Amino acid sequence: MSWDYRPLLSGQSRDPFSSMARGALWCASGFYNVAARHRRRQYDSGNREICNAGVPVISVGNLTTGGTGKTPVVADLCRRLRAMDFRVTIISRGYGASDGRMNDEAMELQERLPDVPHVQHPDRVEAARIAVEELAAEVLVMDDGFQHRRLQRDLDIVVIDATCPFGYGHVLPRGTLREPLDSVTRADWVLITRVDQVDPEEVLAIRSTIAQHAPDCPVLETEHRPSTIQSSVGDWEAIEVLIDQPVALVSAIGNPDAFEQTVLDCGAIVVDHLRLPDHDSYERATREKLRSWVTKLKGGPQPPQRLLCTHKDAVKLATDSIAGVPLGYMPIELAYRTSEEPLQLRLELLMGGSVENQSSRDDSA
């Protein structure tokens, strides 16, 4: 199992070792903070080159490491753009990919959006070039792009997870902020995800913190809603079958607590949860450990009737059972608690301008 660093970073661990570790991490964060601010000044002052892809670029990113729920946001944006009849391509760095294969996020998006190409490249400027020149993309959605400022973007969307919004108040490694919190001033929109998993007062506090740094930035509230239970072979069941059903969970994601809470909210009884490192590739040793774990649970006082994982895990496991216990996943869809109309209008305005610019170029040619 992976080490749970959250009690240390959050301050819940009060033992002497944890206190010393937080002090050491705080010192290291000072160097990281200086480097992050220097990099930001370089871009803000124009000392670093920013490349134009030639088509609109919509960035979906976050302030923190770990799972904030970007994938359903990316899928939602791509569906909206496809409904407007534009050729969309997703570009990303491809973190966790190996041997030329797509990473788990790209595999999940491919299943969600079979008509949307996905270009993964360590250099996202090159990924944008491939998408535009070779795939004739008319708009790019850059996954995890907030800190990747070398590619110019026309819309910067920051995703904040309500269950852990601001990385314990510190940049890496003392917290999980990728850059200082005031960087949210660059955002054009903020989407707060999983607002249903926290109290309304906490959502108001998140909004207040955002407003301190970006008072004019629109903020939308969203929930992650499971639609059905699916298997790798395409079978599906209504989500209601989980009510009072003993289940065991396995996940290799950045925010396993949020996944577990989603399952609990569906009425299931969670017997155990095997938490693996984020982006674990489920190699043979991991699969053997997984089978042993399930076998042990089957002989326990409350054997699980079903195993559940996330969509990201399902595309890597590629099986419908483990040790004789059915395995399924719950596709998560984005549901807007606040009106989504302003975002839709912003996309239409962005793409309408793109069409006009393209027409002008065609006329001048």
UniProtKB/Swiss-Prot annotation:
Catalytic reactions on record: a lipid A disaccharide + ATP = a lipid IVA + ADP + H(+)
Keywords: ATP-binding, Kinase, Lipid A biosynthesis, Lipid biosynthesis, Lipid metabolism, Nucleotide-binding, Transferase
Pathway: Glycolipid biosynthesis; lipid IV(A) biosynthesis; lipid IV(A) from (3R)-3-hydroxytetradecanoyl-[acyl-carrier-protein] and UDP-N-acetyl-alpha-D-glucosamine: step 6/6
GO molecular function: ATP binding; tetraacyldisaccharide 4'-kinase activity
GO terms, biological process: lipid A biosynthetic process; lipopolysaccharide core region biosynthetic process
EC number in record: 2.7.1.130
InterPro entries: LpxK, P-loop_NTPase
Binding sites annotated in the UniProt record for ATP: 64-71
Superkingdom per UniProt: Bacteria
GO annotations of cellular component type: plasma membrane
Pfam families from the UniProt entry: LpxK
Family: Belongs to the LpxK family.
Function: Transfers the gamma-phosphate of ATP to the 4'-position of a tetraacyldisaccharide 1-phosphate intermediate (termed DS-1-P) to form tetraacyldisaccharide 1,4'-bis-phosphate (lipid IVA).
Name of the protein: Tetraacyldisaccharide 4'-kinase
Gene responsible for this protein: lpxK
